[in-house]
């Protein structure tokens, strides 16, 4: 039985026009379908017409359209490579930003920017007892920065205790800070038996 001459499935049925391609060649990623490919296929009076969806160029041969699509693909690949190179160069040229050195470090209990270290230092109060008395006196701590001059003169007073002389402190000796009572005396370094006595002073010839 002979095959029908008009059967399009017959492989021996070649087209009359050699310029028309039945099996157009496209690169990977492109399809001959107008819905999924990168072109539009239209049927015209002169034959099939292929239009590029990227630049709207029209081609009458599928091979010409395939080469045109290859150029679009190469352009996209080149653009992607250029962007990747720019990103790498940007990361190499500009390292991660490091903030300025912090001034919040501390050495011991002193913090930079804290003005507490510049406050006047006050000496702790000293408790002592007079010889032959059970009362305890407290010497008020002086200021760290005494005034230039004192309005009160300095006096030397004898306190009778086995011939020991004691020097009375006035406001000038305490750095300008007024004492609650003028009878407070300056006592020297501690000695044995837990009592404090004044250091020996040279005899006073004025009295």
Curated annotation (Swiss-Prot):
UniProt cross-references to SUPFAM superfamilies, sorted A to Z: beta-beta-alpha zinc fingers
Position of the signal peptide: none
Zinc finger motifs (C2H2-type), residue ranges: 50-72
Main location: nucleus
Single GO molecular function: DNA-binding transcription factor activity
Record keywords, A-Z: Developmental protein, Differentiation, Metal-binding, Nucleus, Zinc, Zinc-finger
Biased composition (Low complexity): 1-16
InterPro entries: JAGGED/SL1-like, Znf_C2H2_sf, Znf_C2H2_type
Subcellular location: Nucleus
GO CC annotation terms, alphabetical: nucleus
Chain spans, region Disordered: 1-20
Role: Acts with JAG to promote growth and patterning in stamens and carpels. Promotes the growth of the abaxial and adaxial sides of floral organs. Promotes the growth of the pollen-bearing microsporangia in anthers, the carpel walls of the gynoecium and the establishment of the correct number of cell layers in carpel walls. Promotes leaf blade growth and trichome development.
Protein name, UniProt field: Zinc finger protein JAGGED-like
Annotated source species: Arabidopsis thaliana
């Amino acid at each position: 039985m002979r095959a029908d001459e008009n059967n399009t499935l017959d492989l021996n049925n070649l087209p009359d026009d050699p310029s028309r391609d039945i099996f157009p060649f496209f690169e990977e990623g492109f399809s001959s379908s107008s819905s999924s490919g990168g072109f539009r296929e239209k049927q015209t009076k002169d034959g099939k017409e292929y239009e590029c969806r990227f630049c709207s160029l029209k081609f009458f041969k599928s091979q010409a359209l395939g080469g045109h699509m290859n150029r679009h693909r190469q352009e996209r690949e080149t653009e992607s490579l250029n962007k990747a190179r720019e990103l790498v160069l940007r990361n190499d040229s500009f390292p991660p930003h490091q903030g300025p050195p912090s001034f919040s470090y501390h050495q011991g209990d002193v913090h930079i920017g804290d003005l507490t270290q510049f406050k006047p230092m006050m000496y702790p109060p000293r408790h002592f007892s007079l010889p032959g008395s059970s009362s305890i006196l407290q010497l008020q701590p002086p200021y760290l920065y005494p005034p230039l001059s004192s309005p009160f003169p300095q006096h030397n007073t004898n306190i009778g205790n086995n011939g020991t002389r004691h020097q009375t402190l006035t406001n000038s000796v305490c750095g300008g800070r007024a004492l609650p009572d003028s009878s407070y005396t300056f006592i020297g370094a501690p000695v044995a038996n837990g009592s404090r006595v004044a250091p020996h002073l040279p005899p006073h010839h004025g009295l």
